[in-house]
A protein has these predicted regions:
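Active-site neighborhood of glycoside hydrolase catalytic domains
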Residues: 390-392, 424-426, 430-587, 599, ...
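Polysaccharide-binding surfaces and accessory modules of carbohydrate-active proteins
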Residues: 5, 10-13, 31-261, 277-279, ...
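Carbohydrate-binding surface patches
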Residues: 231, 642-685
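C-terminal beta-strand-rich structural cap/linker in extracellular carbohydrate-active enzymes
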Residues: 700-730
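Conserved, mostly hydrophobic/aromatic
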Residues: 18, 162, 286, 332, ...
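Glycine-rich, aromatic-flanked loop segments that form ligand/cofactor-binding clefts
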Residues: 70-73, 78-110, 116, 242-255, ...
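Aromatic-lined carbohydrate-binding/catalytic grooves of carbohydrate-active enzymes
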Residues: 323-460, 473
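Short Pro-Gly-centered flexible turn/kink motifs
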Residues: 97-106, 281-300, 719-726
Length: 730
């Protein structure tokens, strides 16, 4: 069994195939963290709770409450009672006093996993996952706290979430609720996070823990370009293949915090959840509040094992789309080809040329609705602009279908332009503070998705367009963050609920969309990758990775993203050069190889690109058809990092049964008088013999991984090559 409880020792035990997680109860009913790490096979003990140690004096510990709580490895710490480290739960009573102390009441172990109401969350059958629900309670507040742990044994993952139930008569204010805490002794941990900006999202950052608190967070109403809801603690010297890694990833698309605190006793408390800044929730008598989920994994074989655990987990237990295990169509998006300057004839010209190159879908981006010829108007007015889309949307879609392409369309449903019919009719639908001039970003406001009538309007606006024509793909965009937090719908006490209610509104809209249109391929986007998070994956199998499509910039963006997300989730396109973001010119072949490590598509005007580039597209589309299953389903191995060596990049994708391995090598910069470069590959069966496709060269898997492989023959910068190794069957 993945979950066990030792009644005599009062120890909970959670086992995955490679890890064990232990919790124990004190005589007073406090739930403490004992261990998380390599799989244990013998009986567990609770001595790591240090229940008899005095934290301040060398005398016998009299269990003085304040000193005990400030050093005890609390499984779910609460605020206001003497634990002065970061708490996970702060509750204020009706009299305005803040304090909460929870004790164990009971627990339940069952096969399967319950859905989280209104939230994206992992799922699994009764054979795939086992869940432990621990019921704790503050008897004074009459507040129940349900700590849920779901063990996905095969994927080496434990998920955690928290639910609050107000069983009393008074109204409570939740001022902070985090979803997970990991309280451990320090092992000279370093903190690994993902940081960035618009057009350079999710770059890897790593550094030693210092005393005090270190965190990543967002207060923008989205997971953001700048920080990512992911934290890993790693031991010094951790590489792709060795070292301890503790990963925590938040399944949420709004404000978050991930924080590690190194304290006076050299213990580390790592917490993750909804950011407490500008958060508050009124919990009335009889009401419940469900916090989002955190996905945890432990690896003792470096970052590579963590990566593959997350990849398998998200593929098997987070993404619901029918496209999860099916080939995605090769699309061409007209944004960088035309921006707002297009009409029916131009789109059909692109479609005809795209079809001749082997492309399978045309996506019409921003500018098809209202009077939208720039970004200064019409968001919210989701009516087709027949001056541009001559003959109407159905005519355009039908004509594209006749050419032999499928059709997709762009929306930004959460936004409203001040210069729009919708805003003139309903200014109160925009998030803003009455009497204060609201801040515009990209000349737009954000709709108040806490209002049911707004949700209904937005949904029907999108759904009616999809019902009107044969549209099989939607790109759902969000191009600004939230500010001026005010809702004319919510009362004064509820204003701090707006950030979270907004995110719940987004989830409700996308849930309705994928329910009515189950065959729809939905791709989320937010100014590129500002809302690339597990919450969005629950609704869309792919997310636009970044607005930066430059092949070299994408190396670090896709390296960081692929550390936790499957390659099939990363929207990646071949675009024109000079690149529209950085002005760099790279070979068309390299752009294709980098985009192959994602969803693979095109973002250019295929009617205008150089003929030598256009001639390469049919070969690139054949390349995608050949390798799409391997890229989508295979095991990912990071071989070398351009971020670290500043010269080259390399990764490998191995079939689950090791029958084939695809290696991508990107030669970023040349150096004079250089030998061939030896790279140590991964992902092979050490006992098998492989042939390098296109040659007669044969290698054992053991040689490729231990002795290495020589790459050579590169002249000039920004070049790349694929190496396809196939297992010899005789």
């Amino acid at each position: 069994m993945a979950v066990q409880f030792n009644e005599d020792k009062k120890i909970f035990r959670l086992d995955t195939k490679k890890s064990t997680y232990l919790m124990g109860l004190t005589p007073e009913g406090y739930l403490g963290h004992i261990y998380y790490g390599d799989r244990l096979y013998k009986a567990a003990e609770n001595y790591m709770l240090r229940m008899e140690e005095p934290p301040y004096t060398p005398s016998v510990n009299k269990r003085e409450k304040s000193s005990f709580l400030d050093s005890f490895p609390m499984e779910y710490p609460t605020g206001g009672i003497g634990d002065y480290r970061e708490s996970c739960l702060n509750v204020r009573n009706e009299a305005g006093q803040m304090g909460c102390e929870i004790h164990y009441v009971s627990h339940e172990i069952y096969n399967g996993k319950k859905a989280l109401k209104g939230l994206p969350a992992s799922f699994g059958t009764e054979e795939e996952v086992q869940t432990l629900d621990i019921l704790c309670e503050d008897e004074i507040l009459r507040l129940q706290v349900v700590l849920s742990y779901s063990v996905f044994e095969k994927e080496n993952v434990i998920t955690r979430s928290v639910k609050l139930i107000n069983k009393g008569d008074q109204k409570l204010k939740i001022e902070k609720i985090y979803s997970a805490c990991l309280d451990m002794d320090n092992e000279n941990f370093e903190m690994l996070t993902l940081h960035g900006s618009w057009a350079r999202e999710r770059h890897i950052q790593q550094g030693p823990l210092r005393y005090g608190k270190q965190m990543v967070s967002s207060t923008k109403g989205e997971s953001s370009h700048q920080e990512h809801p992911f934290v890993a603690l790693v031991t010094p010297g951790t590489t792709q293949q060795q070292g301890k890694v503790y990963g925590m990833h938040f399944v949420y698309s709004g404000n978050f915090i991930g924080q590690a605190e190194l304290n006076q006793f050299d213990s580390v408390r790592t917490v993750m959840g909804i950011n407490k800044e500008e958060f508050g929730w009124i919990l009335k008598a009889g009401e419940e509040f469900q916090a989002p989920e955190v996905v945890m994994t432990y690896s003792h074989e470096g970052l590579g094992e963590m990566t593959r655990s997350y990849h398998d987990f998200y593929r098997n237990h987070m993404i619901r789309s029918k496209y999860l295990h099916n080939k995605r169509p090769i699309l061409i998006n007209n944004w960088e080809a035309t921006y707002f300057d297009f009409n029916t004839d131009k789109l059909l010209d692109i479609a005809r040329e795209a079809k001749s190159c082997g492309i399978e879908m045309l996506v019409m981006d921003d500018g098809w609705f209202g009077v939208r010829n720039s970004d200064n108007c019409s968001l919210g007015d989701w009516k087709v602009n027949t001056d541009k889309i001559i003959g109407g949307l159905k005519y355009l879609v039908d004509e594209v279908n006749k050419i032999g392409l499928e059709f997709g369309i762009w929306f930004e449903p959460e936004m409203i332009s001040p210069n729009s019919d919708l805003y003139r009719a309903h200014p109160e639908w925009a998030i803003q503070i009455p009497g204060r001039e609201a801040t515009q970003s990209r000349q737009q406001y954000v709709l108040d998705l806490s209002r049911s009538e707004v949700l209904d309007y937005v949904y029907e606006s999108v759904a009616s367009i999809l019902r009107s024509a044969n549209i099989v793909y939607v790109k759902w965009d969000m191009n600004r963050q939230l500010s001026d937090l005010g809702s004319t719908y919510l009362g004064a006490e509820e204003q701090q609920e707006l950030f979270h209610r907004y995110v719940l509104g987004v989830y409700a809209l996308q849930e309705r969309l994928v329910t009515e249109f189950p065959d729809l391929l939905l791709e989320n986007c937010s100014g590129g990758g500002a809302r690339f998070d597990p919450g969005m994956l629950y609704y869309s199998p792919q997310i636009w990775c970044s607005d930066d499509t430059d092949a070299i910039e994408r190396l670090m963006i896709q390296e960081g993203t692929s550390m936790i997300y499957p390659l099939s989730t990363m929207g990646a396109h071949v675009s024109d050069c000079p690149n529209h973001t950085v002005g760099r010119v790279t070979p068309f072949e390299t752009r294709g190889h980098v985009a192959l490590a994602g969803t693979f598509g095109y973002e250019l005007d295929v009617t205008k690109i150089p003929e030598e580039d256009r001639k390469m597209i049919p070969e690139q589309t054949k390349m995608y058809h050949k390798y799409h299953e391997l890229v989508r389903e295979g095991d990912y191995y990071r071989i070398a990092s351009y971020r670290e060596n500043h010269l080259y990049d390399c990764w490998a994708i191995a079939a689950k049964d090791k029958r084939e391995v695809l290696v991508t090598y990107v030669h970023v910069f040349s150096t004079p008088n250089a030998h061939s470069r030896r790279i140590f590959l991964q992902g092979f069966d050490p006992e098998a013999v492989y042939v390098l496709e296109g040659t007669e060269e044969k290698y054992t898997g053991e040689m490729l991984m231990k002795c290495g492989f020589l790459v050579k023959g590169f002249w000039g910068d920004f070049k790349s090559k694929l190496y396809h190794f196939v297992k010899v069957t005789e």
